[in-house]
């Protein structure tokens, strides 16, 4: 899955190649500073070892560094973090391929207007998008009444396919 591989900086792509090759099974990738990389798949959770291979236990797994997180954020923001300030303030970035990248760090507040930005980002959660053709086929006819599209609210817990349905 090329769009998944392009999330990562060029110099780290060889490390992520196996995960990208298994893209159709990957649901989420979790990167936390000083913690093992976790790859959540449709078949279970795995940890990445230092060569990018998958293993079932965290022992000897690759530990994410602050530098890796910083380089990833810079890459995702095309080296212009300020240009992405609004998205970062929302807590996530959306990248090519529809993948969503959640960010967690230290909140910087701005007077009474709320959150200004995040700094010291230490956790990145990559939600891998999957196109499922025909996902809305059963529900689409129910959204129309006498040829007019009806106001609709789609509600479900995280990870239950709201975005997939809309695609």
Language-model-detected regions and their locations in the chain:
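Walker A (P-loop) ATP-phosphate-binding motif of ABC ATPase nucleotide-binding domains
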Residues: 151
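Hydrophobic anchor at the beta1->P-loop junction of P-loop NTPases
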Residues: 154
